[in-house]
Amino acid sequence: MSFNFADTPIPIRTEIQEAMRKEWAFLAAPGTWWSGEERVQIAAEARRAMAGERSGDELPAAVAGVVRTVAANSPLVSAEWVEGLAAKGVDMPAYAEIIGVLARLSAVDMFHRALGLPLEPLPDPEPGKPSRTPPPTNLVFGKSFVPMAIMVSIPQTVSLVPPETVAWQELSDAMYMTLGEMGNPDFRQALHRTQMELVAARTSQINECFY
């Protein structure tokens, strides 16, 4: 079974294991704009980029370039860069789905690295075509590079593709806290809320992740 964490130095909460298994199933399934095979290939390309390895040949070169830039060279991402993606065959909704896949992959992989564990093998893709469901119409440009819902929630950055928002929120609920728990300044799991936020803020600073 995936994500059993049998060799971890500390016990891993059951809800984290279940959330990661659910994420792997979602990654392998056809998405809104990318097939299951393409989604797994996107994840594999991101891992190669993070490891400093050469690009694979599964994805079109332009798509692989987008994945590698976001995964391993994010300072190059700008509003102008995102606006230019359509000319490379990657429109805004398709880009938002890539962001969703990579954001959750990063969370899972960094969790393993922090525990000194090998990365979980990527899932086998499921057959089927992407749904091509049109994006919502009530989205706006704010400080983001893609249109999004007007909500104070990081997963809403991919609200062009609602299933990606749902998947991101579910993983965040297990690995961090739920939206309801965020309203409690005295929330505690293994760490108190203030300790959790200190770790989160320091990690964001080191990674130059500002929002």
Each predicted region: which residue ranges?
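Hydrophobic alpha-helical segments
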Residues: 1-211
